[in-house]
Curated annotation (Swiss-Prot):
Tagged with keyword Nucleotide-binding: no
Species, as recorded: Phaeosphaeria nodorum (strain SN15 / ATCC MYA-4574 / FGSC 10173)
Any one of the GO BP annotations: mitochondrion organization
Membership in a protein family: Belongs to the misato family.
Pfam family name, one: Tubulin_3
Subcellular location field: Mitochondrion
Protein name: Protein DML1
GO cellular component terms attached to this protein's record: cytoplasm; mitochondrion
Keyword line: Mitochondrion
Signal peptide: none
Chief location: mitochondrion
Length: 521
């Protein structure tokens, strides 16, 4: 069945994940509607509620800190509430009953209240979204919700900020309860033929250490299983944060880069504050609701080929995408970019270009993949971070491989014109293009105001996303290494910097063996 199990680590990933799951839920169709082109069995698991009714809940494991879940209950409307008497009334070693102290429950958002009552919800805005659960449209299985009670969200006395804190917490809980066995194995073992795991995680705080502990354990447990990790963070780019914390974020992100870049099948770093943005994007980088929405468009589009039914082009599973960008098996870090457009405007432009091409007797408007210069360009670069460090100025970026996904009439070459990653005699970068027969839906839980495309009244977006391995990845890794070698202690420096150098060198092999790395002085 090619199932995918999703792991979400931390507040940032859950803002993104909520948008992602809302989008998946919107693809469900019911008779007499036509069958959805999306195979829901890949991401959703069937079940039976206590009342005997059928349920369909995400194959997801969601971690967050105490207080970060908002009004979300572990036991929701699909399942009976647990009877507290089963705990309080059973005999124990103490002669008297325990006194249970409960925190004041967080009231649901107005949006959630309307959904619960079957009413059309009001429009959301930055001030009305307090928690990621405030705009969730999906019910989760109780086993999907995992609260880390050791830390409170936004706790200034004991913040969950340092990479080592997250790694240490994972190791502690793994020794005590075997997290993988308790939390993840039930989801994996109910799959008929799992396609892989996808991880959404923060990387520039303690969640990076938590995710690193997880992925090392996953590699021990599941060997060569496909694991895609999407690493989210400011990585020191948020000027509103104090200097000391920004420097700590950069160290955290570098430690995450080393471990996740080495252990993941594909690791995609995503900046919360993209350096390259188009004029049609109005993003409030201080709002995780905004940031998660933009990230969800790209992530959901980039991987949609792995969820489509085979009858509508579902041939690009996670392994196919990996093979395209990572021909050596060692270039695991990908540069992610995308473009967004109004589908009606895009179709009009496409028709005009085709008409003009036919009139002149040529098809010059069609793109080819003969060399790097003729690869598609994108409007939004969520990978590159301007570290203002020594860079390979004057050297042209060399592309090794790229996987692209398009939704809408983007005027690209047909799939069968793309270069086959399995053909070693092809010259130039390997390239695979996948098309999806559905546009990205703009739901009422989505901040539609961040885009100024078309009339502004559309309910869907056209998306073109690309994941690339190129020498630009090595440039970013080396820039990170140059900075963190001045920030970390001698004991950690050698192992961390050597690990980063090894990752960067994979993008030199067969192309350019030179490096910009300096010796420690």
């Amino acid at each position: 069945m090619r199932e995918i199990v999703t792991l979400q680590f931390g507040e940032r990933s859950n803002y993104l994940g909520t948008h992602f799951w809302n989008t998946q839920e919107s693809y469900f169709t019911y008779p007499p509607e036509a069958e959805s082109p999306v195979n829901h069995d890949i991401l959703f698991r069937p079940g039976i509620a206590p009342d005997g009714s059928d349920t369909f809940t995400p194959r997801a494991l969601i971690y967050d800190l105490k207080g970060a879940f908002g009004s979300m209950r572990k036991i929701n409307a699909l399942y009976e509430p647990e009877d507290d008497r089963s705990i309080l009334d059973q005999p124990g070693v103490w002669p008297s009953k325990p006194i249970v102290q409960r925190t004041q429950p967080i009231p649901p958002s107005t949006y959630q209240e309307h959904l619960d009552n079957g009413l059309d919800p009001p429009a959301l805005n930055i001030s009305s979204v307090r928690y990621w659960s405030d705009y969730s449209r999906v019910f989760y299985h109780p086993k999907s919700i995992a609260q880390l009670s050791e830390f409170d969200v936004n706790d200034t006395l004991m913040p969950f900020e340092k990479w080592e804190v997250g790694k240490g917490l994972f190791e502690k809980l793994e020794r005590e309860v075997d997290l993988v066995d308790r939390d993840l194995r039930p989801f994996v073992e109910e799959c008929d033929g799992i396609q892989g795991l996808q991880i959404f995680t923060g990387v520039d705080d303690a969640w990076g250490g938590w995710a690193s502990g997880w992925i090392e354990r996953l590699r021990d447990e599941y060997g060569k299983m496909s694991i895609w990790t999407w690493g989210l963070g400011d990585q020191g780019a948020n000027a509103a944060v104090g200097r000391e914390r920004r420097l700590q974020q950069m160290v955290n992100a570098s430690q995450s880069l080393q471990t996740l870049g080495e252990q993941s099948s594909v690791y995609i770093p995503i900046s919360n504050s993209p350096t390259k943005t188009p004029s049609y994007l109005s993003l409030d980088a201080t709002s995780l609701w905004h940031v998660g929405a933009l990230q969800a468009i790209g992530l959901e589009s980039m991987t949609i080929s792995s969820r489509l039914r085979t009858s509508v082009g579902g041939r690009g599973n996670l392994q196919d995408l990996e093979d395209t960008i990572n021909s050596t098996g060692k270039r695991r870090i990908g540069k992610f970019e995308m473009s967004i457009a109004d589908p009606e405007v895009l179709s009009e432009n496409y028709s005009k270009e085709m008409a003009q091409a036919e009139k002149t007797g040529s098809m010059t408007s069609r793109r080819t993949s003969e060399d790097d210069e003729e690869l598609s360009s994108f409007d939004i670069d969520v990978f590159t971070r301007d570290y203002r460090a020594v860079s390979r100025s004057g050297k042209k970026e060399h592309v090794f491989g790229r996987a692209e996904v398009s939704r809408g009439d983007w005027n690209l070459t047909d799939d069968n014109e793309a270069r086959d990653p399995h053909n070693r005699f092809n010259q130039g970068p390997t390239l695979q293009r996948y098309t999806a027969p559905i546009l990205f839906p703009l739901l009422d839980s989505y901040p539609t105001s961040i885009f100024d495309v078309g009339s502004g009244l559309g309910t869907k977006l056209a998306v073109h996303a690309g994941l690339t391995t190129s020498t630009a990845v090595a440039g970013q890794i080396r820039a990170v290494e140059q900075i963190v070698k001045r920030l970390v202690g001698i004991e950690e420096r050698e192992a961390l910097c050597n690990g980063l150098q090894v990752l960067a060198e994979e993008y030199d092999e067969g192309w350019d063996s030179g490096t910009d790395s300096d010796d420690d002085g």
